[in-house]
Amino acid sequence: MNIYIRTIFFAPFICLLIFSSNHGLFQKKDNQNCNSHKFCLNCSGSYLKNSRWLSETSVSYSDEGEPLKYGANDNNYDSNLLKSEEQKQEISEHMKMLIKLYIDSSHDSAKEEKLFQQVKKYFKNNEYKDFMRTFIKVIKIHNDLTHLKKQMASTEKRYRIISCVAAFLSTVSLAFTVVMLSTLNLKNENVIVTIILGLLGFIISLPVISYILSPYLNSSLEKGYRIADLYSEKILRQILHFQ
C-alpha cells in the first residue's frame, strides 16, 4: 500500500520533469534553425549577421519606409479585417520595398544593415517564405552577374593597354627598319644584314595584327556586356513583379 501511495505522489513530479526537458530541447532546435538562414549579399561574400529573431507580429510601413509594429490591442490595425487580395497586395508592396532597398544598398552600409534586419523578419513569417527563397536565389544570380561584369571591365582595361603598347612598338619597329635600310648600301655583303634587319622589323611588328583585330575583340567584349546587363535587368524586373 505504501508503494502505491509513493508512486501516485511522485508521478506528477516525474511528468513535469520530462515535459520541461523536452520543451528545452525543442526550443534549442528552433534557435538552431533560426541561426541557419544566411545568404550572400555582395560579391565579397558577406553574410547575415547573427542577432535576435523578432517575434511574429504584423508589419506595416510608413511613408519613409520604416517598419511599424502593431500590437494586438491597436485599434488602427486589425489583420482580421484584411481581405486575401489586400494581403497579397500588401505583401507585393513590401517585397518591392525590399528589392529597392537591396538595389540601393550596394554602397551604403546603413541601408545594408537595414536590409539584413528586414530579411530576418520576413524569414520568420510564413506568408513570405516562398518569396524569400526566390529572393535569395535571385540575389545570388544577380551578384554573379555583377561579379562577371567587373571581371569583363578589368579584362577590357588590360586589353586596351596591351593594344596601345603593341601599336607603339609596331610603329617604332617599322620606323627603325626603314631608317636602317636607307643607310645601308645595297651591295652583296650587306644583303644578309638587310634581310636580318627586315626580319627583325617584321617580328617586332607582329603586334600590329592584334591592333588590326582590336575592333572585333572590342565588339565581343561589348556583346558580353550587353548580355550581362540584359539578364541583370530581366531578373530585377521579374522579381519586382512578383505576385
From Swiss-Prot:
The keyword Transmembrane helix applies. Residues 52-56 are annotated as: PEXEL motif. Residues 1-24 form the signal peptide. It comes from the Eukaryota. Its main location: host cell. It is a multi-pass membrane protein. Residues 182-191 are extracellular. The record marks 54-55 as: Cleavage. One of its GO terms (cellular component) is membrane. It is found in: Host cell membrane; Host cytoplasmic vesicle membrane. The P.falciparum Export Element (PEXEL) motif, also known as the vacuolar transport signal (VTS), is a pentameric sequence (RxLxE/Q/D) required for the translocation of proteins across the parasitophorous vacuole membrane. In the endoplasmic reticulum, the motif is cleaved after the leucine residue and the N-terminus is N-acetylated. By binding to host chemokine CX3CL1, mediates the cytoadherence of host erythrocytes infected with parasite mature forms (late trophozoite and schizont) to endothelial cells, which sequesters them away from the circulation and thus prevents their elimination by the host spleen. This is CX3CL1-binding protein 1. It comes from Plasmodium falciparum (isolate 3D7). The lineage of its organism: Eukaryota, Sar, Alveolata, Apicomplexa, Aconoidasida.
